[in-house]
Structures are given as structure tokens and as C-alpha cells.
Amino acid sequence: MKKSVCFVFALILLAGSVCPLFSGAIDVEHYVMWIPGTANGYIGVYCKKGEVAKSPSEIPEYTNEKYFYNFIGWYDWRAQTGGTTEDLRSFVKEYYADPSWPRGEPFPEFDPQPVIEDTPYFAYFDKVPKKFVLTEGSTKATIRDVTVLLNLLTGMDQPLREGADGDVNGDGWVSIKDVTGILLYLTYGVE
């Protein structure tokens, strides 16, 4: 009896480990990055392990019409630059902080390639993304969102705890104004 129970349990574990291989799922961790100066400040996702997501349909959270005009692909800033923190800051300033972007110029050729673990890929478009319809939910970012931004822009681990600067009432949320202020300071050195 014990052997049969163990056998069934082993089959369940095996099925659980094998099924994801055939599900077509992509291991992607999402976040929204707010950059001042653009129509809505939207930038990309954070990809981890697996293939690059090639269309918004593979990212359910971002398929809403208000987020996209026409999705083109992912831009691997590490492959196109030296991959340093300063390169990322320059990338952000050049491609996303300019209110007139895009300037009728195509982004660099996108060459799909396997995702290197923990490599950020940024979404880009052939038109400026639509402006968000601001609602209670879309005017706030989580503490985790801000932490990811700080880590990307500084290369250091700077977690924001509940009650920290930016989280005025200690509820774990940060306003868009706070996020924009943080990014302005990090990218331009101004408050």
C-alpha cells in the first residue's frame, strides 16, 4: 500500500515538473517603469529565464488598448551598449526622456536572442504609447516597483520599506509623483 501511494505521489511530482515544459509559458517578471517627459512614462518588462516575449499577447497585463499603439519588439540595451549603469542612464535619457521621442527615427535593429538571466529587455514602439487614463490604481506604484527602478538605475540594492520616503501613509504604495521625482533625481541629478 505504501509503495503504491509513493508511486502515485512520485507521478504527481513528475507531471508537475514536466507539464510546464509543454505549456508554452514564458518565465517573465513584469513591472512598469515611469520615466518623466514621455506621454505616460511606460517602459518594458524584466525578463528572466526563457525566450524573449515577442508580442503583447504573451504579457496579459499589457494587452489593454491604452498601453500600446503598435508593439515592435524588445530592445536589449546590454547588447547594444557597454552594459554599465551609466550606459543605462544614457539609454533612458536618449530614448525615453525626450518629449519629442520618437523623432521619426527607427530604433536600432532588434536581433532576437536568448534571454540572459536577469537581463532587462525594454519594449519599444513605432509611435508614442497612448496616455494612461489615470485611475486610483494607475496613479500608484508598489514599493517593489520603485525598488526595481532604483536597482536598475543605480546597480545597488536600495529597497524602500513601508513608511519610507515616498510611502507617505505606510500602506506600501508610492505615488507616480514620488516615482517621477526619484527618476528625475537619478537620471538628471535634479529634484
Sequence positions of predicted segments:
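Positively charged n-region of N-terminal signal peptides that target proteins for export
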Residues: 1-7
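Bacterial N-terminal signal peptides
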Residues: 8-20
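Generic structural signal for beta-strand residues in well-ordered domains
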Residues: 6, 64-67, 113-116, 142, ...
